[in-house]
Structures are given as structure tokens and as C-alpha cells.
């Protein structure tokens, strides 16, 4: 099977949906294959381990929740204050509600991070990168 970026993205999106719908215990290669309507074994060809699945999910969540640069450029031109703060919050809520599966999957990862140090480490790295991008 030829690996390609588009299929990897489709599988990562399927993994996000599986995690959001079934929780951490339901996140398996087979469940991802089924959700993506891909032949059995496809997800394991792209993601050799659960850690690789988690990394792909975090990358995909990051891409899906990325702020619109035009909106943020507009907000950056406004004077600081309560209204600006409210606009930033509205933008965050809008992105989370438009990407419900990604938001729920992120909560699932936060729960799993309390039990699995590798997930906690990946989530911390992801959050720090997001913070640096915001600064």
C-alpha cells in the first residue's frame, strides 16, 4: 500500500472521531479502520503504535482548532480591553463548537494523560507549542 498524506489525514480524523465517540478504551487500529472505512490493517500501516496514534490525533486537533489568521490579525489591531477579551473568547468557543469531535477528543486525551505519562508528555509538548504560537 502506498502511504500518502491525504490518507494519513483521513485516518487521523477517524482516530479523533473514535476517541471522541468511544473514549480511550475504544481507540484501536481496527476501530480507526472501521471509522475511516479503510481495509483492515490500514491504520497500523500508518501508525505503528498507540503513541503514534496519539501524536497524529494531537497534530490533527491542532490543525482543526487553528485560529483563522485573518480574524486574529483583525483582533490584534484593536485596543486592549474587555470587548477584545470577549472577542477572543468567542473565537475560541466558535472553533471548539465547530470542531466538536476534536474538542471532546482533547478532553479524552487530558483524562488519559492522568494515567499515562507518555500521553501527558505529548499533551504538555502540544500545549507549549500552542502557547508559543499565541505569544
Where are these regions (language model features)?
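N-terminal intrinsically disordered/low-complexity leader segments
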Residues: 1-6
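Solvent-exposed, amphipathic alpha-helical segments
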Residues: 10, 14-22, 67-71, 105, ...
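Short, basic, alpha-helical segments at the C-terminal edge of helix-turn-helix-like DNA-binding modules
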Residues: 59-66
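Helix-turn-helix
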Residues: 10, 14-56
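Hydrophobic alpha-helical connector segments
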Residues: 56, 69-102
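Amphipathic alpha-helical packing segments from all-alpha helical-bundle domains
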Residues: 66, 97-107, 114-135
Amino acid at each position: 500500500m502506498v502511504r500518502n498524506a491525504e490518507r494519513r489525514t483521513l485516518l487521523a480524523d477517524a482516530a479523533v472521531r473514535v476517541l471522541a465517540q468511544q473514549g480511550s478504551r475504544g481507540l484501536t487500529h481496527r476501530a480507526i479502520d472501521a471509522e475511516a472505512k479503510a481495509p483492515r490493517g490500514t491504520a497500523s500501516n500508518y501508525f505503528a503504535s498507540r503513541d503514534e496514534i496519539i501524536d497524529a490525533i494531537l497534530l490533527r486537533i491542532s490543525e482543526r482548532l487553528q485560529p483563522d489568521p485573518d480574524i486574529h490579525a483583525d483582533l490584534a489591531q484593536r485596543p486592549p480591553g474587555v470587548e477584545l477579551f470577549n472577542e477572543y473568547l468567542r473565537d475560541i468557543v466558535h472553533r471548539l463548537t465547530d470542531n466538536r469531535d476534536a474538542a471532546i477528543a482533547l478532553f479524552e486525551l487530558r483524562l488519559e494523560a492522568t494515567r499515562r505519562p507518555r500521553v501527558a508528555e505529548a499533551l504538555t509538548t502540544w500545549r507549549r507549542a500552542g502557547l508559543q504560537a499565541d505569544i
